[in-house]
Amino acid sequence: MTCTTFLVGKKASLDGTTLIARNEDGGDKPNPQRFVVINPENQPKHYRSITTACEFDLPENPLSYTSTPDADSSYGIWAAAGINSENVAMTATETSTTNSRILGLDPYVETGLGEEDFTTITLPYIQSAREGVERMGQLLEEYGTYESNGMAFSDKDEIWWLETLGGHQWAAIRIPDDAYVIAPNRLNIDWYDFESSDTIYSTGLKEFIDKNKLNPDFDGYNLRHIFGSSTIKDTRYNNPRAWYVQNYFSPETTGNDDPFNQDLPFICHANRKISIEEIKFVMSSHYENTAYDPYSTTSSAAEQKLIRPIGLNRNLELHVLQIRDNIDKKLAGIHWLAFGPNSFNSLVPFYARVSDTPTCYRDTKADFDPTKMYWLTTMTAVLGDSNFQGYVDKRDNFDLNTMAKLRALQNETDKVSDQSLEAVNEKLAQIALTAQTELLGKMVISGSNHMKLRFDFND
């Protein structure tokens, strides 16, 4: 998937929690999403990929976990992300890049694993973020992959980022507690220390690099230089997303005036602690206050179409997976979720330790149905795109008021762990659904006064 990932260590976040977020993006046509819980009895014992027919038995005693699969399962599950009942989170995947030197040595495995499979075969079987890396690495070395991907794992203490490097090679790195990462669709890890306790990698990776003379740098190992790309497409499709977010959070240290820069850093440090609301902003961003904003009223059409925004029509869902410490384990995992294009939606803080999810998020169908949140938010975004400047104030008021109501209910729930979290999630869903419906209604009423098919006549 052509996604964008954002990671925040526990000392870099406003409330001291680990946060891993990703926009799951698709093609230009809608690809409806569901929000479900997979309980142990519903987890397959034998897995078979629809894309490649790769198959094998899965371990016994899986954990329950949240996920956001496609409504149309004919192409596979595509579980995307979730939090398991041990409060370990995973998001997979960020489609990335490679180069011909690597594929000539370690080609893709057409019968291997890919984004369709990773979450389903990993998340129910791990007790920590580090275990997630180890299981994923073992699967990659055994079965291989048919694409280049990045994925994140988190628990209450750690965040790990893993990238595939060809068909079987891979490397992972622990994100420092005081750091953040913005990862577009390129190979993202840069400087890498093979001797560090904060790195894990495939068997013989350093020897593979040295033996095949793959390192272009005189000193050190930069995995992006070795395994990644540096193309014209990167300058317009990938690098600008990292550029905008780094200028937003750390202009003093990583900010610059070049959105096409091929060597933007991987590990970054913000000039303030990062909130959920700010994550929502950057994951919805379209280069606001720059000439590259497609909704700009002052820049040229060429500038507005030059680079790929983070928030766009292809957003299927945004998840922010939060693992909290110093709170009852039952309440610790929060699966923040927003469906559809991020320009006109809101994140909802669903509790992850549940056995079911709200129907307006769970029962999404492939056909249009505005009573389901995915279709309602998508419809709102389509209308909003027709006159963004005319609707943006209504959007901002909706976002402020909706988040305040959701946070108020969350704050009350956090005080009492012995309650039905399924019922709380239903209340959260209804707050969001009502607010989204009201926003759409206000936009329709306002927009009707500005239709081209009109004629002013006093009678």
Swiss-Prot record:
Keywords: Dipeptidase, Hydrolase, Protease. Its EC number is 3.4.13.19. Pfam families: Peptidase_C69 (PF03577). One of its GO terms (biological process) is proteolysis. Signal peptide: none annotated. The active site is at residue 3. One of its GO terms (molecular function) is cysteine-type exopeptidase activity. It catalyses: an L-aminoacyl-L-amino acid + H2O = 2 an L-alpha-amino acid. Belongs to the peptidase C69 family. NCBIfam families: C69_fam_dipept. This is Probable dipeptidase A. It comes from Lactococcus lactis subsp. lactis (strain IL1403) (Streptococcus lactis).
